Amino acid sequence: MKNPYLSIVIAGRNDNYGGDFNQRLQNTLDWISHWVNHYHLPAELIFVNYNPIAENDSIAEMITFPVATSYFSTRIIEVAEDVHQELLEEGIRKPVPFFEFIAKNAGIRRAKGKFILCTNADVVFDPQIFEFLSKQNLEEGVFYRATRVDFNSKEKLIFAGNEANFLAQVHRNVFKYFMRGGTYLLKSPLSLYTTFRLLNIYNFVRRLFYTAIYPFRKITRIFYIPFSEELFTFQYACNASGDFFLMDKESWLKERGYPEDTWIATHCDSLHLLMTAVSGVRQKNLPWLVYHQEHERRFNFDTENHDMNLMYHHLLANGAVMTSQKCSFNTNTDDWGIFNYDLEETNV
């Protein structure tokens, strides 16, 4: 497709990350293809195949990528192992085999769409999001966010063309909500969106409370009132922002994508959101949810981890300065997104 309205960028590799990456990715691809074609949304999917493992089957052998239609096309962009090796920098990036946000930047730099949506390879969007996008009324100079919820089940859910059944199972198995300024573990007997609306009200009041007592945070700690270190966590939709971040291409290029000099990927999405917001791009939050398929992960928020602590304090320190001084710290060079390399590309 020469002139898609929307480019959807995701990244991954042929390592079956978390033990079931292939099935999660297949769900995501099938879901996107189904709804893009259903709503006649001119879109391209860009899958950045980062540092593939030579001895494993290729990602094209593991996954059935959607066939091209008059409304939808798929491009696979490969970042080969030798390119990955060139990106290893001691003391700058932890030497892991997958640099998530450099991979996404590679897709962003090469996207053809007027608007670019970055998401993850195991996220499915509420159908109303596709309907909204199909109206082609997105604004330039605005970034769009959607709240992520996590779902799991005893048996892995597989989307096999029955969207109503799949979505009903997803709704029944939601157990975690990533709201602005707070994450909530909650299994509710109410419908998902009723629960979400009630939780939004509670979270709004909670944000007002913590914003009000922020000037007195040193005193409140004496009374054991838990407090996030910085006010910006309540002001901006940083929580799980890497699962849905939509913006016009011109703004993506102006902001130079995600920061590429972070030690690990954790909180890189939050840093990027703050960099974008303080640069004057307006924030809009969509009223619909995106559904993340729960899995085992490399960096887990539930366990103590030095690298994650390091990145969290990096976020707090830099976020506080950026939001108070309204200045961005993105140090990406002009060749961000591996733009100085001619990457191999396959059209599906």
Regions found by a protein language model. Name each.
Residues 1-37:
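N-proximal low-complexity "stem/linker" segments adjacent to membrane-targeting elements
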Residues 5-9, 44, 271:
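Cell-envelope/extracellular polymer assembly enzymes that use nucleotide-activated donors
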Residues 15, 38, 48-64, 80-84, ...:
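A conserved acidic beta->alpha catalytic loop
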Residues 57-110:
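Active-site-proximal specificity loops/subdomain of glycosyltransferases
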Residues 95, 108-109, 126-260:
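Conserved catalytic core of nucleotide-sugar-dependent glycosyltransferases
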Residues 116:
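Short aromatic/hydrophobic "clamp" motif used to bind/position activated sugar donors
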Residues 119-121:
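Catalytic metal- and UDP-sugar-binding loop of GT-A-like glycosyltransferases, i.e.
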Residues 226-227, 233-242, 249-250, 261-348:
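C-terminal catalytic/acceptor-binding lobe
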